Curated annotation (Swiss-Prot):
It is an enzyme of class 2 (transferase). HAMAP family: MurA (MF_00111). One of its GO terms (cellular component) is cytoplasm. GO terms for molecular function: UDP-N-acetylglucosamine 1-carboxyvinyltransferase activity. This is UDP-N-acetylglucosamine 1-carboxyvinyltransferase. Pathway: Cell wall biogenesis; peptidoglycan biosynthesis. Keywords: Cell cycle, Cell division, Cell shape, Cell wall biogenesis/degradation, Cytoplasm, Peptidoglycan synthesis, Pyruvate, Transferase. Gene3D superfamilies: Enolpyruvate transferase domain. The lineage of its organism: Bacteria, Pseudomonadati, Pseudomonadota, Gammaproteobacteria, Pseudomonadales. The gene is murA. UDP-N-acetyl-alpha-D-glucosamine binds at residues 93, 122-126, 308, 330. The keyword Transmembrane helix does not apply. InterPro entries: Enolpyruvate_Tfrase_dom, Enolpyruvate_Tfrase_sf, MurA_subfamily, RNA3'P_cycl/enolpyr_Trfase_a/b, UDP_GlcNAc_COvinyl_MurA. Phosphoenolpyruvate binds at residues 22-23. Its EC number is 2.5.1.7.
Length: 421
């Protein structure tokens, strides 16, 4: 199993390019199953989850064509099986996103209950209830969700999400694109990745309006056709590198990104003492060598502060001046990284859904273990600011969400290397 070794204490300085958003690329890839002609998706990040989704397509008889620039052409007309098997689905929660498109386009689907990061319960009941509202008959047995559309296809429905669910919104929105009649989704997720998926569906001929608000309206169409679409930049990768630079007192310029996607994060970085400039497709952060100030953070669905940036800000607060609180309202059990950071000398106290972080002058390198995707990123940041060497184990979590993380950090001057397991 690969490991990362980081020698800390170096200020990050330089320029890197931000990759396409994993959390946008995965639903967009799933949505290609709705089209009856080839679709090309560009700006895909080179990540394990993307590879797994493409491998899943191959198992189903769809043969994607990938070029050297990580664009992929998908022709779903060649699909041979409507089963998403457990051995692939178990490693990636986003595989549930093929459920809606397959039922809508082919009338049935059999998808193993998904895996992915072990963060709280993350139930799939909203996906199931949404499809049932559209007339699908669904059974959950033997670890599989077995869904069948009614004769004549799915019917448009008015569906209210009891809790805001990004993947739930995406799955039902995709299914509704080919349903008969109008669907109205209330209390829908407002995340930019949902908007990106809606834009992709509309580029294929769908009629989706309201994405980015809590009410999305979809008028079903008879067919969706191919086209070419570029995935939006990854706002969480953007935020992670900005926090890494801030924690080390450094300066970075990030290209091919969009400052409007993470205003809540930028606001907190300014509060921490960062100087930030932005353009249409770049962000520059400069700490001017200063130690950051502790900030208080409360996670909530977009456009509030994202839960996927919570762990990184705990790492920032760990070496900041003062004490900051981080309140997690989206997922339970999302402070597993705290115990690893405390082994490095951090002073973090967890009380329920709140982490109280008292900044220390420095952390000390230590062997630590990644527990989930964003927790791993926070340990990388901690390693960058720590004295001595930090060895991070189980970095397959990092590879699920960050493209070439060690190469990008090396471009910024970090001493980091991967050791094959």
């Amino acid at each position: 199993m690969d490991k990362l070794i980081i020698t800390g204490g170096i200020r990050l300085d330089g320029e890197i390019r931000i990759s396409g958003a994993k959390n946008s690329a995965l639903p967009i890839l799933a949505a290609t199953l709705l089209a009856d002609t080839p679709v090309t998706v560009c700006n895909l990040p080179h990540l394990h989850d993307i590879t797994t989704m493409i491998e899943l397509f191959g198992r189903m008889g769809v043969q994607p064509i990938i070029d050297e620039k990580l664009s992929v052409e998908v022709d779903a007309s060649s699909i041979k099986t409507l089963v998403a098997p457990y051995e692939l689905v178990k490693t990636m929660r986003a595989s549930i996103l093929v459920l809606g498109p397959m039922v809508a386009r082919f009338g049935e689907a059999e998808v193993a209950l998904p895996g992915g990061c072990a963060i709280g319960s993350r139930p799939v009941d909203l996906h199931i209830r949404g499809l049932e509202a559209m007339g699908a008959k669904i059974d959950v047995e033997g670890g599989y969700i077995k869904a069948k559309a009614p004769a004549g296809g799915l019917r448009g429905a008015h569906f209210f999400f009891d809790t805001v669910s990004v993947t739930g919104t995406e799955n039902i929105m995709m299914a509704a694109a080919l349903a008969n009649g109008r669907s109205v989704l209330e209390n829908a997720a407002r995340e930019p990745e949902v908007v990106d998926l809606a834009n992709f569906l509309n580029a294929m001929g769908a009629k989706v309006s309201g994405a980015g608000t809590d009410t999305i309206v979809i008028d079903g169409v008879k067919r969706l056709g191919g086209g070419r679409y570029s995935v939006m930049p990854d706002r969480i990768e953007t935020g992670t590198y900005l926090v890494a630079a801030a924690a080390t007192g450094g300066r970075v310029r990030l290209k091919d990104t969009d400052a409007t996607l993470l205003e809540a994060v930028l606001h907190k970085l300014v509060e921490a003492g960062a100087h930030i400039d932005t353009g249409s497709d770049w962000i520059e952060l400069d700490m001017k060598g200063k130690r950051p100030k502790a900030v208080n953070v409360r996670t909530a669905p977009y456009p509030a502060f994202p839960t996927d940036m919570q762990a990184q800000f705990i790492a920032l607060n760990a070496i900041a001046e003062g004490t900051g609180t981080v309140i997690e309202t989206v997922f339970e059990n999302r402070f597993m990284h705290v115990y690893e950071m405390n082994r490095m000398g951090a002073q973090i106290l967890v009380e329920g859904n709140t982490a109280i972080v008292t900044g220390v002058d420095h952390l000390k390198g230590a062997p630590v273990m990644a527990t989930d995707l964003r927790a791993s990123a926070s340990l990388v940041i901690a390693g960058l600011v720590a004295e001595g060497d930090t060895l991070i184990d189980r970095i397959y979590h990092i590879d699920r969400g960050y493209e070439c993380i060690e190469e990008k950090l090396q471009l910024l001057g970090a001493k980091i290397r991967r050791v094959p397991g």
